């Protein structure tokens, strides 16, 4: 027997679970969007006890018919790959217990590196970091993990605002994490606060500048982000037509490309040894070696040992991508980091003393920061949340695509509205919870595409893991003890992946002359600023009026931050440049079609042919 079509007026339970792999069939898209209990039509609802009994006492409930071999077997290079024959599990489908655990762990490992990296970098050492003590940094990492898990639950379950047509959350397997977009604006803001004397410094006799801890600067970042998060909330209520006009693919691709490219500088500096005082390679003092002279097996900045450590992470990641199984490929960055940690421990560079003295558990608000709003940071952080809105829309589009949900029409627009609203609220709630702003992550979409499991049950398991890791502070201490070269080797791969996502989005364009002009103009200024950060530093005058000077500092920060300039130029040019009557084929008539509408390629991981449509 087979079940009726989802569009049918009646719904029946399939007699063969191995054939349909459903616990229930749902009748309409509207029913699917409800929270789990309401997603089950009354005619097939079973008692809670019978569902629990079936889930935990049968092979179907524990194991199911998923192709675990395809998930775990390594893929040899240059050998034809067999497509994953596992069933596809949609967002609202129940999945076996073991599969939920495996998928939850896989999604967790795919995002953990991206979640902790911004917090590690902004709390670290240097002129554009907070230079905080180990205990405070441990707490900040714990808070970022806890908040990421909590806000992931909001995105996954999708709640309707009572008596309205609006939602909070996308209702998809979307894990949230600390956005990389926070990093450039936060670093610029902290750097300005050190320059202006808001944050303390100490100058040695030889002229070496030591940047002292500045926890109040983090409070200013949190307060400023909370105010600016209302921009994303406002965008979530805009008509879909306006959102599509403001944030087309060309804007999204340019911004992501510039974010990833500009962050590579920080990643490479950490690969060489860190961003602290040792970076200037002083010949005297406490920082001739990195991170300091008294660190275990300290090395000079840019030395061969640091280079080799970072390379061990980077190239292990590439080797796993070459020969690893689907599971290992999805967690390749974490495996590379673990290999690097083993090598660092073997040569005596891994200091575990901070792990020993760290408390067993922590919670939000164990440490607090004085909230304030930093005037010169408002304009840059408005663009941070504008970019987060762009990121969110791109991630939700990809999530719907890999989850078997249409990426156009009322259903998608409702999910986009709910996802944007949840991200905006996350900016406020994460600030109150002492964490940088979180946004939907794109890594999960890749995991869904190759595992064919988009069930929200797996997402809930991932969120629970994030919350647990945030509570157990020994884990945060272990993450903090990782030497800077290993963080650098991992982060350059993550940052380049962000840039690659932007390139992929741009490849969908038709590349008309108009497109090329917008991209060229945006990248000219944005990448130029990334290469020469002081390009605009001395343009604005210095005045005694504090308020006016704050305004000038805000302009300098905006013009000195590459991805903000990319966003401004791409949005403005996209709105004012006229569309062409015909695509410009004069320069490219004989060239093969490398991207844009009509491009067809084969996705080897998914085992299917995909056509890119305009």
Residue ranges and their predicted role:
Residues 117-125, 181-191, 396-403, 437-450, ...:
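Re-entrant/interfacial helical elements at transmembrane boundaries that shape
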């Amino acid at each position: 027997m087979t079940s009726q079509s989802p569009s049918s007026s009646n719904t029946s339970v399939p007699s063969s679970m191995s054939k349909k792999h459903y616990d229930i069939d749902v009748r309409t898209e509207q029913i699917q969007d409800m929270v789990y209990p309401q997603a089950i039509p009354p005619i097939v609802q079973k008692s809670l006890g019978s569902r629990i009994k079936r889930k935990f006492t049968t092979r179907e409930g524990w194991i199911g018919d998923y192709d675990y071999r395809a998930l775990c077997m390594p893929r040899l290079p240059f050998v034809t790959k067999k497509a994953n024959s596992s069933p596809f599990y949609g967002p609202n489908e129940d999945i076996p217990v073991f599969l939920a655990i495996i998928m939850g762990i896989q999604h967790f490992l795919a995002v953990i590196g991206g979640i902790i990296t911004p917090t590690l970098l902004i709390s670290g050492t240097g002129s554009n970091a907070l230079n905080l003590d180990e205990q405070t940094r441990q707490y900040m990492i714990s808070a970022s993990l806890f908040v990421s898990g909590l806000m992931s639950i909001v995105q996954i379950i999708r709640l309707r605002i009572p008596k309205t047509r609006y939602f909070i959350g996308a209702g998809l397997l979307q894990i949230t994490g600390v956005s990389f977009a926070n990093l450039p604006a936060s670093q610029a803001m902290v750097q300005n606060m050190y320059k202006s004397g808001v944050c303390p410094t100490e100058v040695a006799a030889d002229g070496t500048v030591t940047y002292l801890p500045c926890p109040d600067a983090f409070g200013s970042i949190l307060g400023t982000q909370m105010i600016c998060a209302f921009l994303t909330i406002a965008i979530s209520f805009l008509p879909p037509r306006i959102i599509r006009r403001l944030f087309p693919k060309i804007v999204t691709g340019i911004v992501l490309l510039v974010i990833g490219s500009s962050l590579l500088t920080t990643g490479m500096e950490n690969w060489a040894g860190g961003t602290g005082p040792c970076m200037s390679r002083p010949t005297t003092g406490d920082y001739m070696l990195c991170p300091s002279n008294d660190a275990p097996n300290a090395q000079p900045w840019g030395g061969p040992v640091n280079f080799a450590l970072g390379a061990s992470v980077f190239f292990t990641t590439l080797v796993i991508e070459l020969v690893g199984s689907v599971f290992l490929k999805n967690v390749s960055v974490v495996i590379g980091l673990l290999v690097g940690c083993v090598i660092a421990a073997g040569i005596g560079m891994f200091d575990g003393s901070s792990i020993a003295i760290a408390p067993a558990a922590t919670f939000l608000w164990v440490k607090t920061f004085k909230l304030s709003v930093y005037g010169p940071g408002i304009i840059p952080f408005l663009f941070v949340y504008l970019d987060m809105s762009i990121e969110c829309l791109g991630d939700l589009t990809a999530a719907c695509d890999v989850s078997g949900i249409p990426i156009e029409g009322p259903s998608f627009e409702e999910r986009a509205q709910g996802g944007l609203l949840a991200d905006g609220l996350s900016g406020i709630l994460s600030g109150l919870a002492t964490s940088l702003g979180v946004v939907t992550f794109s890594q999960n979409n890749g995991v869904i595409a190759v595992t064919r499991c988009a069930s929200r049950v797996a997402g809930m398991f991932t969120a629970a893991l994030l919350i647990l890791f945030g509570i157990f502070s020994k884990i945060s201490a272990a993450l903090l003890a990782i030497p800077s070269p290993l963080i650098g080797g991992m982060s350059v791969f993550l940052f380049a992946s962000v840039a690659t996502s932007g390139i992929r989005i741009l490849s969908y364009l038709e590349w008309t002359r108009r497109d090329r002009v917008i991209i060229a103009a945006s990248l000219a200024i944005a990448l130029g600023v990334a290469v020469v950060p002081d390009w605009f530093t001395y343009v604005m005058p210095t005045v005694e009026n504090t308020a006016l000077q704050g305004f000038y500092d805000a302009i300098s920060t905006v013009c000195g931050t590459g991805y903000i300039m990319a966003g401004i130029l791409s949005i403005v040019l996209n709105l004012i440049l006229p569309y062409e009557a015909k695509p410009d084929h004069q320069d490219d008539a004989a060239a093969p079609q490398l991207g844009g509408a009509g491009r067809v390629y084969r996705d080897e991981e998914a085992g299917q042919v995909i056509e890119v449509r305009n």
